Amino acid sequence: MPVYAKAIFGSFPSVQQVRVENGERCLIEAMDELNKNEKGLYRPVRLENGDQISTTDDVLNGKLARVSYTPFEEFELVSNSKGSCMEYENQEQSSKIMEQMRILRQTEELCDVELLVAGSVIRAHRYILAAASPYFKAMFTNGMVEMKKLTIELQDIPEESVRIIVDYIYTDKIAITMNNVHQLIFTATVLQMDVIVVACQQFLATMITSHNCMSLYHFSDIYNCTNLISSIEDFASSQFRCIRKSPEFNSISFHHLKSLLNRSDLNVSEEQDVFETIVQWVSSNPRDRQHHFVQLFKTLRLHLVGWNFLCEAVNSNSYVKNSQECREIISAMVLDAMTPSKRKHPESNHENTSEYSASMACPSLTASSSSSTSTFRKSVAGAIFCAGGRGKAGGPFSSVEAYDWRRNQWIEVPDMMSQRRHVGVVSANGNLYAIGGHDGTAHLATAEAFQPSIRQWKRIASMKTARRGIAVASIENVIYAVGGLDDTTCYKTVERYDIEEDEWSTVADMDVQRGGVGVAVIGRYLFAIGGNDGTSSLETCERFDPMIDKWKRIASMKNRRAGSGVCVLDGYLYAIGGFDDNAPLETCERYDPDADKWITLDKMSSPRGGVGVAALGGKVYAIGGHDGSDYLNTVECYDPIANRWQPAAEIKECRAGAGVAWANVRMHQLSRTPEKCDSGCAPSGGSYCI
């Protein structure tokens, strides 16, 4: 039980109450009345025999007259509004304790274990080691002989790395360098110091090059460095066009090669690169690798391989000929190609158009094929272009941006020859076409074409009618320019551009005037969606059949829309955003041509009038626009499976009324400089600290 002692001093008594424990050393403050605000002395006293405290120390003005204790009851406390308990936390306490432990280790005080490593002794405190390392905890707590030994020998472990790790345990700091990272990963793995293993992987991830990529793969497998393997695969995928040609590439394991070839972001020039890589890898050691050929062949996305290559290279290859399963895969693909189906290709952006057919030399694999092999490679999936439009300053743009799906970023490409807002943009015959619009002074009939292979725009024949708010689409390398408006008229006229002849002609007018109309192609039909007739925004739609040169009404949308974005994905037509008669819209709809029916989709995160829309990679992208207050540079993409919009990489310019279209181009064609292998090397002697 606690005892409270009274200390009475000299002729000037000062009573101090001190809580002590029986037989426990304590401190009593001796203070005289005259100097109680100036001086204080602390003298050790001991409770003796349970009833008397004594000391021989002098205090202040005289000797201690007497010291006695009087046990008494503890005073009563009553709970108040602040509660009956106060929790106190000192967040600095643990760090102060570790600082003291570090000092104790430096001075070799209270050290109770010696680690003998390669003839060197490292002194430490076993409780600290056990708390930091599961390896040491097991050694010191599981009845092992080391529990009672002062000196413990660690065999076959580098002394330097053990010393670095023990220092880290006491200091929370470690310097990882090119010279010690291999030993640190090994030692940290033995000592089960996962945090150091992860840090070493992070350091090595910054050192990956096309030259050490394969050896790091092997190293990562040995130590099960899953984080590093992921970083290596990302690097190898982005640099695949380079590393597949290196002599070291053939050393890659089957498991890693298969994982790499399955990636949609694999950077290839053509899908043929994948087949050639498979053959190269198997042929480097056919006796041990030929049995892997079928599994690797299944990573090949046959719908991306040209017919000529399929027949001449793939079908004639000895590994393919000797595999019944490979032959069956090819036969199924050919049979599927001969059985047209409107919605076989979940990734199609321009189904059944000449541009799409040109980009997809083979139709898709059968529905029974794995999803990963029935999709595009991002590097050969084409690009979305965003051209012209206008921003806050009011003047139209001539600038053009292209979306790199693999890198999830927009890049600048050469400007158009003219500034154009509310311009029509479409891809056809390997080129990108910009048609009509307004240049800030006048409505335009002019048109121009961009050739990705030489990164240049050129003039083409002008339309018969100058107009903005025009929509364009292509069928069989023929471009149709639909509707639009000028300062006095909303048009229902439609012009047809013959790419071969570089000549415009007129076709049948639409039933309704449509300025700010959206158009898209499904099969052999051209669809005109919404727009404005000069009086109000429209919900009506119609379909054009070039074979008979006639328009036909189809089901109306659920919302009036002008300046909306329209595209096709998986055989469905999407109408996104736009303006009604009052404000920009965030609503979206999808049209099923088989059922002649519109359904409502998930709303975008923001209203977007004058939005540009295109499909890529199985998703619909809504680009820029105006939300009623501001011009936007934000981009959203719609996942039809999840019925959900998600943000995507932003365009560089805030713009509305831009022309947006998907085109079958390779991103490396659009770069100002040729794509090079990325060495990723860090400076010599580089280090990584945690």
From Swiss-Prot:
User: Where does it sit, as one GO cellular component term?
Assistant: neuronal cell body
Q: State the Kelch repeat positions.
A: 383-430, 431-477, 478-524, 525-571, 572-618, 620-665
Domain called BTB: residue spans: 111-178
Domain (BACK) spans: 213-314
One of the Pfam families matching this protein, by short name: Kelch_1
Tissue specificity statement from the Swiss-Prot or TrEMBL entry:
Expressed in neurons.
Compartment annotation: Synapse
**Gene Ontology molecular function, alphabetical:** ubiquitin-like ligase-substrate adaptor activity
Which keywords fit this entry according to its UniProt record?
A: Kelch repeat, Repeat, Synapse, Ubl conjugation pathway
Q: In which pathway does it act?
A: Protein modification; protein ubiquitination
Claim: Repeat is one of the keywords in the record:
yes
Q: Which SMART domains does this chain map to?
A: BACK (SM00875), BTB (SM00225), Kelch (SM00612)
Which InterPro entries does the record cross-reference, listed alphabetically? BACK, BTB-kelch_protein, BTB/POZ_dom, Kelch-typ_b-propeller, Kelch_1, SKP1/BTB/POZ_sf
The alphabetized list of GO BP terms reads: proteasome-mediated ubiquitin-dependent protein catabolic process; protein ubiquitination; ubiquitin-dependent protein catabolic process
Functional summary from the UniProt entry: Substrate-specific adapter of a BCR (BTB-CUL3-RBX1) E3 ubiquitin ligase complex that regulates degradation of glutamate receptors in neurons. The BCR(kel-8) ubiquitin ligase complex mediates ubiquitination and subsequent degradation of rpy-1. Indirectly regulates the protein turnover of glr-1, possibly via ubiquitination and degradation of rpy-1.
Q: How does it assemble?
A: Component of the BCR(kel-8) E3 ubiquitin ligase complex, at least composed of cul-3, kel-8 and rbx-1. Interacts with rpy-1.
Protein name, entry field: Kelch-like protein 8
